[in-house]
């Protein structure tokens, strides 16, 4: 029998650690009265939306201004005294206490990185205190849906030093019978793609998210991915489709989109994306238009919303207020979920809940600056989101999430269901 006093928060410590880009980030440990401990590390993005919660950095010379010692101090000197004595089981109360302590709209006082590290560590401590895996603790008995992975195998934009304007070209192995088989299919295409790039004399160096970063145009990238899928023995659009993260805010200036040597209005940009959808087996487009181009997004949704998944990342920033605006205006049909965009686990779960109740899909996502923390793998199963974006099939901070999903699938045994096998997640276009 577990004593409820054993699940009370006793101690919180924090430290500065490194992310996958060699930049400092925040790690927190929450220790409970009964001895259980939870640890979490927060990620960091390169292409960040203007409406994201505030990530606190030190400035100055240390770590070229990117240190997080101030965030660590906030955890140990301000957050810890406020939370010690609270039950780790009451995630909403823990998160609410931190939001009240911060007092700002965007977590600029304590920093979203401080709040999120403690928020995630608290959930893990509670799960460990109860002897439950994190996905089961957060999701209950129905947490058995393994997500379709959106695998970023060609990197461009802000994630790579190459000529490719669009940020991510992804494989979507929705036609697999299980997550394990989906991972195998994606991995085989990844290695086939490497051979194709080598044969064409192109670079096989990788970007921040583990995908290749060759000098290609957007159409060429689509063509070589389709070729890789076929050469690996799979049917494009039937077994494996494509997804794009355009990250168009990155090349939007003065009301126009400048890429591939051209300059386009919002309507012309929609036309460009429509051409790509007609040319390739694309099932999902993320950030097809800029974060505040609401009129353009509305047009994009009218033109393509019935054909493909239209994911708002910079548009929604995991924020229920912006998501509600999109719902009210019939804008997009999916939300990208990044825990550090909003900065607490409770608010993340609220965004996923609002999306589901409104007929929007949710895609659980990593950031380009990642760590060995695997919380998002458990979160994807806990929330039955049905989709996860956690990079390519290389770099251990990406593979860590895939390996955790393999463990979860094994642990669930016959109860495990792969989202692609039951028609959830992006649909194929044979």
From Swiss-Prot:
<keyword id="KW-0456">Lyase</keyword>
<dbReference type="GO" id="GO:0006096">
    <property type="term" value="P:glycolytic process"/>
</dbReference>
<comment type="function">
    <text>Catalyzes the reversible conversion of 2-phosphoglycerate (2-PG) into phosphoenolpyruvate (PEP). It is essential for the degradation of carbohydrates via glycolysis.</text>
</comment>
<dbReference type="InterPro" id="IPR020811">
    <property type="entry name" value="Enolase_N"/>
</dbReference>
<feature type="binding site">
    <location>
        <position position="338"/>
    </location>
    <ligand>
        <name>(2R)-2-phosphoglycerate</name>
    </ligand>
</feature>
<dbReference type="Pfam" id="PF03952">
    <property type="entry name" value="Enolase_N"/>
</dbReference>
<comment type="pathway">
    <text>Carbohydrate degradation; glycolysis; pyruvate from D-glyceraldehyde 3-phosphate: step 4/5.</text>
</comment>
<feature type="binding site">
    <location>
        <position position="245"/>
    </location>
    <ligand>
        <name>Mg(2+)</name>
    </ligand>
</feature>
<protein>
    <recommendedName>
        <fullName>Enolase</fullName>
        <ecNumber>4.2.1.11</ecNumber>
    </recommendedName>
</protein>
<feature type="binding site">
    <location>
        <position position="313"/>
    </location>
    <ligand>
        <name>Mg(2+)</name>
    </ligand>
</feature>
<keyword id="KW-0963">Cytoplasm</keyword>
<keyword id="KW-0460">Magnesium</keyword>
<keyword id="KW-0324">Glycolysis</keyword>
<feature type="binding site">
    <location>
        <position position="167"/>
    </location>
    <ligand>
        <name>(2R)-2-phosphoglycerate</name>
    </ligand>
</feature>
<feature type="binding site">
    <location>
        <position position="367"/>
    </location>
    <ligand>
        <name>(2R)-2-phosphoglycerate</name>
    </ligand>
</feature>
<feature type="binding site">
    <location>
        <position position="368"/>
    </location>
    <ligand>
        <name>(2R)-2-phosphoglycerate</name>
    </ligand>
</feature>
<dbReference type="InterPro" id="IPR036849">
    <property type="entry name" value="Enolase-like_C_sf"/>
</dbReference>
<dbReference type="InterPro" id="IPR029017">
    <property type="entry name" value="Enolase-like_N"/>
</dbReference>
<dbReference type="InterPro" id="IPR020809">
    <property type="entry name" value="Enolase_CS"/>
</dbReference>
<dbReference type="Pfam" id="PF00113">
    <property type="entry name" value="Enolase_C"/>
</dbReference>
<dbReference type="GO" id="GO:0000287">
    <property type="term" value="F:magnesium ion binding"/>
</dbReference>
<feature type="active site" description="Proton donor">
    <location>
        <position position="209"/>
    </location>
</feature>
<dbReference type="GO" id="GO:0004634">
    <property type="term" value="F:phosphopyruvate hydratase activity"/>
</dbReference>
<keyword id="KW-0479">Metal-binding</keyword>
<feature type="binding site">
    <location>
        <position position="389"/>
    </location>
    <ligand>
        <name>(2R)-2-phosphoglycerate</name>
    </ligand>
</feature>
<dbReference type="InterPro" id="IPR020810">
    <property type="entry name" value="Enolase_C"/>
</dbReference>
<dbReference type="InterPro" id="IPR000941">
    <property type="entry name" value="Enolase"/>
</dbReference>
<comment type="similarity">
    <text>Belongs to the enolase family.</text>
</comment>
<keyword id="KW-0964">Secreted</keyword>
<dbReference type="GO" id="GO:0009986">
    <property type="term" value="C:cell surface"/>
</dbReference>
<feature type="active site" description="Proton acceptor">
    <location>
        <position position="338"/>
    </location>
</feature>
<feature type="binding site">
    <location>
        <position position="286"/>
    </location>
    <ligand>
        <name>Mg(2+)</name>
    </ligand>
</feature>
<dbReference type="GO" id="GO:0000015">
    <property type="term" value="C:phosphopyruvate hydratase complex"/>
</dbReference>
<dbReference type="GO" id="GO:0005576">
    <property type="term" value="C:extracellular region"/>
</dbReference>
């Amino acid at each position: 029998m577990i004593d409820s006093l054993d699940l009370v928060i006793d101690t919180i410590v924090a430290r500065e650690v490194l992310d996958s880009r060699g930049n400092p980030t925040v790690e927190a440990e929450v220790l409970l009265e009964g001895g259980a401990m939870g640890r979490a590390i927060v990620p960091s993005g390169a292409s960040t939306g203007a409406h994201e919660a505030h990530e606190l950095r030190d400035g100055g010379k240390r770590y070229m201004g990117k240190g997080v010692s101030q965030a660590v101090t906030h955890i140990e000197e301000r957050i810890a005294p406020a939370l010690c004595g609270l039950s780790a089981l009451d995630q909403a109360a823990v998160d609410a206490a931190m939001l009240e302590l911060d007092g700002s709209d965007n977590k600029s006082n304590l920093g979203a990185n401080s709040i999120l590290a403690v928020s995630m560590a608290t959930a893990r401590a509670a799960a460990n205190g109860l002897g439950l895996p994190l996905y089961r603790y957060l999701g209950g008995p129905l947490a058995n849906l393994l997500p379709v992975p959106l695998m970023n195998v060609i990197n461009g934009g802000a994630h790579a030093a190459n000529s490719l304007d669009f940020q991510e070209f992804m494989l979507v192995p929705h036609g697999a019978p299980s997550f394990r088989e989906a991972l195998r299919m994606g991995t085989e295409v990844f290695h086939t793609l490497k051979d194709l790039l080598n044969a064409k004399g192109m670079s096989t160096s990788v970007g921040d998210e583990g995908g290749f970063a060759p000098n290609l145009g957007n159409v060429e990238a689509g063509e070589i991915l389709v070729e890789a899928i076929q050469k690996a023995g799979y049917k494009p659009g039937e077994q494996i489709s494509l997804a794009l993260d355009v990250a168009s805010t990155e090349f939007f200036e003065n009301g126009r989109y400048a890429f591939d040597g051209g300059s386009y209005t919002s309507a012309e940009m929609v036309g460009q994306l429509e051409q790509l959808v007609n040319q390739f087996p694309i099932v999902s487009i993320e950030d097809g238009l800029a974060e505040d181009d609401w009129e353009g997004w509305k047009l994009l949704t009218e033109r393509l919303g019935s054909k493909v998944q239209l994911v708002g990342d910079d548009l929604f920033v995991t924020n229920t207020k912006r998501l509600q605006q999109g719902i009210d205006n019939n804008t997009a049909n999916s939300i990208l979920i990044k825990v550090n965009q909003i900065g607490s686990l409770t608010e993340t779960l609220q965004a996923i809940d609002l999306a589901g109740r409104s007929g929007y899909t949710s895609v659980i996502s990593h950031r380009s600056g990642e760590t060995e923390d695997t919380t998002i793998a458990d979160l994807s199963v806990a929330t039955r989101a049905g989709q996860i974006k956690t990079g390519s099939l290389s770099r251990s901070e990406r593979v860590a999430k895939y390996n955790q999903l393999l463990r979860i699938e094994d642990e669930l045994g016959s109860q495990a269901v792969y989202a692609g096998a039951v028609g959830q997640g992006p649909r194929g276009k044979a």
